[in-house]
C-alpha cells in the first residue's frame, strides 16, 4: 500500500515552504504527496533555493525531482521571506483543516505539517493554540502529543501549561485516557503487540514515598495497578532524573512524561534534527516537524530539512501500519 499524504507547509513566510521544495527533490516510493498550499509561495521558495519545482494537478503522478501535486490554498497577500503577515492566517488554518478533512473523508491517509507561528495566527483574529488542538477539535476527539526521534519516544500527560497548573491538570480520568491512547497507538500504528510504557512521576524522585508530594501514592500508582490488571505493561512511576539512562530506555517502547519540560529536553538533546511531533488519537496519522518557523532563516537556503523528511517517512509508515491493523 502506498499511502496518500497531505503536505502542509505551515507559515508561508517561514522555512516550511522551502523545506517542502527540498523534500520533493527525490521522488518518493513510500507515499504520494499532495500539498495544501499557495502556489506562488512554493515557487518563490524554489527560486530562492535554485531548485526545480513543477506543481502538478491533483490527479497527476510525481515522477521527476521537483514534482509536487497541489491543492491550491491561496494566501490573502503575497508572502515575503521572514515577514509573517497576519492577513494570511486564514490560509494557514484553511490548509490545515482542508488536509484534516481530506483524511476524515477517507480521501487521504495522513497529514504531514510544517511549522506554524501561533502568535501570527492569533494576530490574524483566529483563536489558535496549536495544530494538535485544531485537528483534534475538527475530528471531535481527545488526543495525546508524542515526540520521537531515532532514540526515544516521549508522550505527554499535559502539554502547553504553566508549571503551576500541571498538578491540577493531572487527574485519574485524564491520565487513564492518555495511557489508553498511547497504548492503542503503539499497537495499531507502530505494530507493537504488547508495548512497554514507562510512566514518570510528577514529583522529584517520584514523590519519595510521599515526602515530596502525594500525587504518585494517591493517583498514579493506583491507576497503574488497575491498568496492569487489564494487561497493560506499565513501568513506574519512575524518577524522571534517571528514567532516560540508556540502559533503562532500552527496555521501554515509550516514556510518558507528566509535563512538557520533564521529557522533551532529553529527547531534543539526543537528536533534535531528527525529532518529530505526532498526534495520537486522531482517526489518521499526523506527524509534524519539531521546530519552529525560523523566520530569520527563511529564503536563505540554510534550513535543515531532516525533521520534515523524518516526519514524512514516519507518517507513511504509520499509515501503512494502520491499514494492516484495521
From Swiss-Prot:
Keyword Secreted part of the UniProt annotation: no
GO cellular component, one term: cytoplasm
Enzyme kind, highest EC tier: oxidoreductase
Keywords annotated in UniProt: Cobalt, Cytoplasm, Magnesium, Metal-binding, NAD, NADP, Oxidoreductase, Pyridoxine biosynthesis, Zinc
Protein's job: Catalyzes the NAD(P)-dependent oxidation of 4-(phosphooxy)-L-threonine (HTP) into 2-amino-3-oxo-4-(phosphooxy)butyric acid which spontaneously decarboxylates to form 3-amino-2-oxopropyl phosphate (AHAP).
Family membership: Belongs to the PdxA family.
Subunit annotation: Homodimer.
Name of the molecule in the record: 4-hydroxythreonine-4-phosphate dehydrogenase
Phylogenetic lineage: Bacteria, Pseudomonadati, Pseudomonadota, Gammaproteobacteria, Lysobacterales
Amino acid at each position: 500500500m502506498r499511502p496518500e499524504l497531505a503536505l502542509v507547509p505551515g507559515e508561508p513566510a517561514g522555512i516550511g515552504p522551502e523545506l517542502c521544495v527540498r523534500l520533493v527533490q527525490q521522488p518518493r516510493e513510500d507515499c504520494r504527496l499532495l500539498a495544501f498550499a499557495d502556489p506562488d509561495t512554493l515557487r518563490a521558495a524554489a527560486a530562492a533555493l535554485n531548485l526545480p519545482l513543477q506543481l502538478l494537478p491533483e490527479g497527476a503522478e510525481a515522477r521527476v525531482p521537483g514534482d509536487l501535486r497541489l491543492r491550491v490554498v491561496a494566501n490573502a497577500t503575497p508572502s515575503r521571506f521572514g515577514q509573517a503577515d497576519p492577513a494570511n492566517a486564514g490560509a494557514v488554518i484553511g490548509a490545515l483543516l482542508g488536509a484534516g478533512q481530506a483524511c476524515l473523508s477517507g480521501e487521504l491517509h495522513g497529514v504531514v505539517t510544517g511549522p506554524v507561528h501561533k502568535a501570527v495566527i492569533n494576530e490574524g483574529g483566529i483563536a489558535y493554540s496549536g495544530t494538535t488542538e485544531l485537528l483534534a477539535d475538527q475530528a471531535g476527539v481527545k488526543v495525546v502529543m508524542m515526540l520521537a526521534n531515532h532514540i526515544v519516544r516521549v508522550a505527554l500527560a499535559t502539554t502547553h501549561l504553566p508549571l503551576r497548573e500541571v498538578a491540577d491538570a493531572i487527574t485519574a480520568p485524564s491520565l487513564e485516557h492518555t495511557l489508553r491512547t498511547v497504548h492503542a497507538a503503539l499497537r495499531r500504528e507502530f505494530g507493537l503487540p504488547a508495548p512497554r510504557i514507562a510512566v514518570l512521576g510528577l514529583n522529584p524522585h517520584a514523590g519519595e514515598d510521599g515526602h515530596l508530594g502525594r500525587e504518585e501514592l494517591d493517583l498514579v500508582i493506583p491507576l497503574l495497578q488497575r491498568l496492569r490488571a487489564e494487561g497493560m505493561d506499565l513501568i513506574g512511576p519512575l524518577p524522571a532524573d534517571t528514567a532516560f539512562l540508556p540502559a533503562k530506555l532500552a527496555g521501554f517502547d515509550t516514556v510518558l512524561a507528566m509535563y512538557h519540560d520533564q521529557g522533551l529536553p532529553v529527547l531534543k538533546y539526543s537528536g533534535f534534527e531528527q525529532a518529530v511531533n505526532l498526534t495520537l488519537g486522531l482517526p489518521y496519522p499526523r506527524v509534524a516537524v519539531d521546530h519552529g518557523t525560523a523566520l530569520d532563516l527563511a529564503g536563505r537556503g540554510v534550513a535543515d530539512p531532516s525533521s520534515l523528511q523524518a516526519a514524512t517517512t514516519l507518517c507513511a509508515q504509520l499509515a501503512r501500519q494502520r491499514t494492516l491493523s484495521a
